[in-house]
């Protein structure tokens, strides 16, 4: 039975977003599909490619849905790829998936959905949205399948976006989603999951920075805390905090990247133990509730997508930033990555590590 609500489903050509359309139609929603065109001829990508678009269109038509393709190449280049280049050049390690979600999926695409008269945007993310009746606030929760949970990359969502967002896949585990897709006869039911950064499909960030961003790799010194030169590096963007392999340094022991210094183009190396720290600060903070806590909060937090959260206290600072103090030191906290805060299953928000 139809419930009268119209949904625009963001389809990537993968099984999760396609299954989202199947699940929503079963729940009585009137669904159409849409994909964002993110690349021009200069960049090859593994997400939203021509093959992906063909798969998504085939699924949409097979389900009796309309299918739109919206050109967002300029916005993707400006807000995601150009920022990726700028962050690496500033000595940080960004997470472009978070920028894409904020600016494209839940920015440009949600705007288009609402302008076209849809009530909701839906995606295939493994996370959940719930309305808290007592407060009237929408809450972002982890996906039920903890091994696939994608709530980390959604921490920048706000109340307006959550009010118009459906995440049906988040209620299921991956095997159930594939089973639903097979039962619906979807051509991509067994399609493999995408990996890595979509616009760097081969994982060669250095080559991307050089060819797309025009970045020149300037060699410099590897140094220790005493200022001794341990060797030469190939350019700051070639390395990330915590890296051990590929340094080309003979120090008589394992050494790791501790910090990249943009000012003098050096990279500080040291022992693994020196990578652990208990405190970080973050800016560009988002609180999903829209309200900054008035006092410190006990939370769990993680600083990488694949990491398990750790107990911490978050201190809101007067300038809008946060200071996060972990109970147990964390390894390789990296500038440019996101720290995301949880209260049990609920995502409270997060920020960009300084």
Question: Which sequence ranges carry the predicted segments?
Answer:
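AMP-forming adenylation/ATP pyrophosphatase catalytic core
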Residues: 40-41, 122-354
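ATP-dependent adenylation/nucleotidyltransferase module used to activate substrates
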Residues: 1-155, 166, 175, 182
């Amino acid at each position: 039975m139809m419930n009268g609500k119209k949904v625009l489903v963001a389809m990537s050509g993968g099984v999760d977003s396609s299954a989202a359309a199947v699940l929503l139609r079963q729940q009585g929603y009137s669904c159409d599909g849409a994909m964002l065109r993110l690349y021009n001829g200069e960049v090859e990508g593994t997400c939203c490619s021509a093959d992906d678009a063909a798969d998504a269109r085939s699924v949409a038509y097979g389900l009796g849905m309309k299918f739109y393709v919206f050109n967002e190449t300029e916005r993707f280049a400006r807000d995601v790829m150009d920022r990726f280049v700028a962050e690496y050049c500033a000595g940080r390690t960004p997470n472009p998936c978070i920028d894409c979600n904020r600016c494209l999926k839940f920015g440009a695409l949600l705007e288009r959905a609402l302008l076209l008269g849809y009530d909701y945007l839906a995606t295939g993310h493994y996370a959940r949205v719930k309305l808290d009746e007592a407060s009237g606030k929408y809450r972002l929760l982890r996906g039920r399948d903890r091994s696939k949970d994608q709530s980390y990359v959604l921490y920048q969502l706000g109340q307006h976006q959550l009010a118009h967002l459906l995440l049906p896949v988040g209620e299921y585990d991956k095997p159930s989603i594939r089973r639903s897709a097979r039962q619906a006869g979807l051509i991509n039911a067994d399609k493999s999951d995408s990996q890595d950064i979509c616009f760097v499909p081969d994982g060669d960030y250095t080559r991307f920075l050089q060819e797309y961003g025009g970045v020149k790799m300037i060699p410099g010194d590897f140094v220790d805390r005493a200022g001794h030169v341990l060797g030469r590096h190939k350019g700051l963007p070639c390395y990330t905090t915590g890296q051990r392999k590929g340094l080309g340094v003979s120090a008589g022991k394992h050494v790791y990247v501790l910090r990249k210094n943009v000012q003098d183009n050096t990279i500080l190396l040291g022992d693994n133990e020196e990578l652990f720290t208990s405190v970080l600060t973050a800016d560009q903070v988002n609180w999903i509730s829209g309200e900054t806590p008035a006092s410190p909060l006990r939370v769990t937090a993680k600083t990488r997508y694949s990491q398990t959260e750790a107990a911490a206290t978050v201190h809101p600072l007067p300038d809008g930033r946060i200071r996060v103090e972990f109970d147990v030191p964390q390894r390789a906290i990296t500038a440019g990555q996101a720290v995301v805060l949880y209260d049990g299953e609920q995502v409270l928000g997060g920020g960009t590590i300084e």
